[in-house]
């Protein structure tokens, strides 16, 4: 089954047309796309996916070093996320192809975002992350990344996200894991200032 099978031909063509039209509009206006710059040498790329599961040889042939995989269940209404959660078969396939796998936890999104529950949310979500990470062959001593898949305000960070991350970190450490933070630049910067995550 193709990873793109859920994408209809019509939707694909609409998206492609919009992308092309946007490129011409930016070029005509003299606008260039923003560039990201790494702080050090780029070592390679990893991919993040939830809609389906490509096999390890495909990931390797595309030149990636590995993948970032979800150690969380599909949320209600997201049945299309056939790649959640990661499985032991998938991690073994990637290892057999010389690839690395990083674990990331994200269940809710938007109105149901995990972090919106603050510290109480970590008590629910961290044990699930640990259980699914271990079931997929994830070793101790490695980070489990916690996703903050939003563009939060400083107030949301201070009142909900920081308590969520702090409690999540404490639970992970108590079980022999570390925590990473998978978020936008501002959120990562705030977390670094608070000594949260890697």
Task: Give the predicted meaning of each segment.
Residues 1-24:
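N-terminal secretory signal peptides and thylakoid transit peptides that target proteins
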Residues 64, 139-143, 176:
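A general structural motif
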Residues 65-70, 198:
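Short hydrophobic/aromatic-enriched beta-strand-loop microsegments
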Residues 42, 49-54, 69-153:
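Substrate-binding cleft of extracellular glycoside hydrolase catalytic domains
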Residues 5, 27-49:
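C-terminal segment of N-terminal export signals and the immediately downstream linker at the start
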Residues 62-63, 97:
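Short, structured coil segments at secondary-structure junctions
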Residues 55-61, 130-136, 151-198:
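Surface-exposed substrate-engagement region within the catalytic domains
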């Amino acid at each position: 089954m193709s990873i793109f099978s859920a994408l209809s031909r019509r939707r694909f063509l609409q998206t492609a047309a919009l992308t092309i039209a946007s490129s011409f509009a930016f070029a005509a206006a003299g606008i260039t796309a923003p560039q990201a710059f790494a702080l050090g040498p780029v070592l390679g790329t990893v991919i993040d996916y939830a809609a389906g599961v490509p096999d390890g040889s495909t990931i390797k042939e595309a030149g990636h070093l590995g993948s970032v995989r979800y150690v969380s269940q599909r949320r209600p209404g997201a049945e299309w996320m056939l790649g959640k959660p990661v499985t032991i078969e998938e991690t073994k396939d990637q290892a057999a192809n010389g690839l690395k796998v990083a674990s990331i936890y994200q269940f809710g999104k938007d109105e149901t975002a995990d972090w919106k529950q603050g510290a109480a949310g970590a008590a629910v979500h961290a044990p699930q992350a640990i259980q699914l990470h271990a079931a997929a062959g994830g070793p101790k001593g490695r980070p489990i990344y916690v996703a903050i898949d939003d563009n939060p305000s400083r107030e949301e960070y201070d009142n909900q996200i920081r308590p969520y991350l702090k409690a999540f970190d404490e639970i992970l450490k108590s079980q022999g894991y570390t925590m990473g933070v998978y978020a936008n630049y501002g959120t990562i910067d705030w977390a670094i200032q608070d000594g949260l995550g890697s």
